[in-house]
Amino acid sequence: MAGTAGRQDDDRPPGDRARPVERERRPVERERRSVERARRPVERARHWRYEELPGVDLLRARYVHKTFVRHTHENFVIAAIADGVEVFHHGGSDVSAGAGALALVNPDTPHTGRAGVPEGWRYGAVYPSPEVVAAIAAETSTLRGAPGFVSPVLDDPATVRLVHEVLRAAEEGNALAADTLLRVAVTRLLRLNGGTLPERRPRTAGARTAARARAVLEERMAEPPTLERLATDLGTSPFALLRAFRDSYGMPPHAWLTDARVRRARLLLDAGTRPAEAAVAVGFTDQPHLNRHFARIVGVPPGAYQRERKNVQDSR
């Protein structure tokens, strides 16, 4: 037939004819996905102490998919966001801190944490103890009572830079700079966003019951009672205890217990206890159980946490 010279009819079904093209596309698609994965920010974190800053924990981190469950800290949280956005639940609502802002959490205040943008967030944080902050406040402010932060988010690039300079000085072993910059940063934060924390003395019958329940859980951390048994022993009902406990501590008893177990595990790890032994001592079933909860609260696995503590001790 005219116009068919040099062409052979392709008797294959249409689906089979397309397959060579699809095979050609696959390597290109795999390469594209590989490039996209390489461009994604890598999660990393270092949680450590510097012996010349007693009473202060330090953290540098980049998180993308990390989600921090509701938890508390015994120390203050002063987190300086370098880029990205962190969203955290605090005081009954979600708040966000972006680049140039600080996320500020007072001791024993329940909060969460997660990425507010697809690329996550990168930040540096210092965790000074209440005693450290109180000493700085007594010397540099007119605050009376226990000092703390009023707002959980403060846009202040100058203090963000100070916090990162504290971390850099600690990494370089510059004790004079680290101590000086920390004091300047805390003083500035108290001036811009400082206030007096309310007393935590239990004033209502429900609060007193919650405090008694907390004491029982601390004492029986490894083998806690059921909610019903705990309520019966305290002379109340399970739901009444649940409401009172949540009102007093911002989370139900079982969530508070997990948080408390991680806190105690940190103390054991600081003292040199092996992670597997620490897990059982605080009531977790095994080390993987501790690993999961520890990373969701502290931000790093217990093994990495302990190695940094050991490095500090070995350097003395």
Regions inferred by a protein language model and the residue ranges of each:
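Short, Lys/Arg-enriched N-terminal segment that forms or immediately precedes the first helix
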Residues: Y63, G194-R201, R243-Y249
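A short, Lys/Arg-enriched amphipathic alpha-helix from helix-turn-helix/homeodomain DNA-binding modules
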Residues: P152-H164, A177-D179, T196-L234, W256-R274
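Basic/polar phosphate-binding segments, predominantly the helix-turn-helix DNA-binding elements
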Residues: A215-E218, E223-A260, A279-E308
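C-terminal edge and immediately downstream basic/flexible tail or linker adjoining helix-turn-helix-like DNA-binding
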Residues: K310-R316
